[in-house]
Design a protein with these regions (language model features):
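ATP/adenylate-binding site constellation spanning eukaryotic-like Ser/Thr protein kinases
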Residues: 32-36, 56, 84, 93
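Structural recognition of an alpha-helix C-terminal capping motif at a helix-to-coil junction
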Residues: 40, 53-60, 64, 73-85
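Short, charged helix-capping/linker segments at alpha-helix termini
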Residues: 3-5, 20-28, 39-57
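Internal acidic/polar
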Residues: 8-12, 89, 97-113
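Arg/Lys-rich amphipathic alpha helix in sigma70-family domain 2
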Residues: 67-70, 81-102
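Alpha-helical structural segments
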Residues: 29-33, 107
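Extreme N-terminal regulatory/targeting segments of RNA polymerase sigma factors
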Residues: 1-17
């Protein structure tokens, strides 16, 4: 059964059942349906290229863990929650890298002058 209509994609129970069964067409339909919205959502916190990476990572995670998806959970809600958390993790990671870089610059500044 392919999911070609918006109505089909929004039928959470059907989508989860198809994903659990390993339906690649269903996954691709979900990917296409949610991609832009998820990228836009993630770009609230990170640049668009980073947002696109986060969305790809999220969709890969969903596919790799499809057998653990539960029909009672909203796929849309899950996707947006994962994207938000990954975006905030990326910000946190960037801050740590920036802080370490600044500390190293201060520590070794005299050696390079």
């Amino acid at each position: 059964m392919s999911l070609n209509t918006k109505y089909d994609i929004l039928d959470n129970r059907l989508v989860i059942q198809r994903l659990n069964a390993g339906d690649r067409q269903c996954f691709e339909a979900c990917y296409r349906f949610y991609y832009k919205g998820l990228c836009s959502f993630a770009s609230r916190w990170v640049s668009l290229p980073v947002a696109e990476d986060i969305v790809q990572d999220t969709m890969l995670y969903i596919w790799e863990n499809r057998d653990r998806l539960m029909e009672e959970l909203s796929l849309k809600g899950l996707l947006f929650m994962i994207v938000r958390n990954k975006s905030l993790d990326r910000i946190s990671s960037q801050k740590v890298h920036s802080r370490v870089h600044q500390q190293l610059e201060k520590r070794f500044a005299d050696q390079f002058d």
